[in-house]
Regions:
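Extended, low-polarity transmembrane helix blocks
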Residues: 1-33, 44-50, 54-57, 61-120
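Surface-exposed loop/turn positions within long extracellular repeat scaffolds
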Residues: 38-40
Length: 120
């Protein structure tokens, strides 16, 4: 069993990356294509959508390019900090656990890049 898991280890960062990228593509695209001048906490929705979609695309490109992983994760981290501070903080822990989890995963990708499985 350990042998199989050791063989799969170099690829373990791909599934969470795909799930994270898909989530932000699905949530960001409608904001990006909305032509109404809607704002969330004073920020135009298309700007939020640009960060979400751009971050997601960069995370996917990041499967083969380390720099894209780091930049994509940082873009999504900015969105998550804003979501926590401006929208979800009023709900306490019950309203922030998912946002904090996404932020933690993004910070891991931002700091480790594609060296997640290399022990560096």
């Amino acid at each position: 069993m350990n042998q199989l898991l050791n063989k799969l280890s170099p690829y373990s960062h791909i599934l969470p990356r795909i799930v994270l990228a898909t989530t932000f593509l699905v949530h960001g695209y409608p904001k990006l294509t909305n032509t109404d001048p809607i704002t969330a906490m004073g920020i135009p929705m298309y700007v939020i959508g640009l960060f979400e979609v751009g971050g997601a695309i960069l995370l996917l490109i990041g499967i083969i390019k380390d720099w894209a992983t780091r930049i994509g994760a940082l873009l999504i981290s900015v969105i998550m900090v804003g979501a926590i501070a401006l929208v979800h903080i009023k709900d306490g822990w019950q309203g922030n656990e998912w946002q904090l989890l996404i932020l933690a995963v993004c910070l891991m990708y931002a700091t480790k890049g594609n060296s997640i499985n290399k022990g560096s």
